[in-house]
């Protein structure tokens, strides 16, 4: 089951993001979609995060280890893309770009990045920057 997150999900979202090794800044539960197990546990999450320069970032995609490989992340990504049909950006660890290319993202160069991502990419190090046109 996928649904919009509620305030009650905020702790579970934070735990998932931290356990996934994802930067926890900007975690506002109101932007999240969560995947819920049959037992009512939050087993996955993701958000589309707006930035001051107007760009939107697909971010914080995380799934509990025991649910990985079962389509949870795919379902979350598909839902977020359907709800946000315009241009989206994302940063991911090098080597994960292929996963997102399946959803229409493509690797971009520095000169194609919005200002926020251009600045943060220098700090992030080994990441790939991708864009999906709406």
What residue ranges belong to the model's regions?
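Conserved beta-strand in the GNAT
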Residues: 34, 41-51, 55-62
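Hydrophobic, well-ordered beta-alpha structural blocks that scaffold small-molecule cofactor pockets
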Residues: 45-47, 74-79, 99
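Conserved GNAT acetyl-CoA-binding A-motif
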Residues: 82-95
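Short amphipathic alpha-helix that is part of the acyltransferase structural core
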Residues: 1-24, 34-37, 41
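Conserved acetyl-CoA-binding loop-helix of GNAT-fold acetyltransferases
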Residues: 63, 69-82
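Short, small/polar residue-rich loop motifs at catalytic or cofactor-binding pockets
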Residues: 28-29
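Conserved active-site alpha-helix within GNAT-family acetyltransferase domains
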Residues: 94-121, 128
């Amino acid at each position: 089951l996928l649904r919009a997150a509620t305030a009650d999900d905020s702790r579970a979202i934070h735990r998932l993001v931290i356990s996934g090794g994802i930067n926890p800044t900007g975690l506002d539960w109101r932007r999240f979609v969560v995947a819920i197990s049959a037992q009512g546990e939050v087993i996955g999450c993701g958000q589309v995060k707006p930035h001051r320069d107007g760009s939107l970032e697909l971010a914080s995609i995380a799934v509990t280890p025991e649910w990985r490989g079962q389509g949870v992340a795919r379902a979350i990504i598909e839902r977020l893309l359907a709800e946000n049909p315009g241009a989206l950006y994302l940063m991911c660890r090098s080597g994960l770009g292929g996963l997102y290319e399946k959803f229409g993202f493509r690797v971009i160069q520095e000169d194609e990045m919005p200002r926020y991502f251009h600045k943060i990419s220098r700090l992030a190090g080994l990441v790939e920057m991708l864009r999906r046109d709406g």
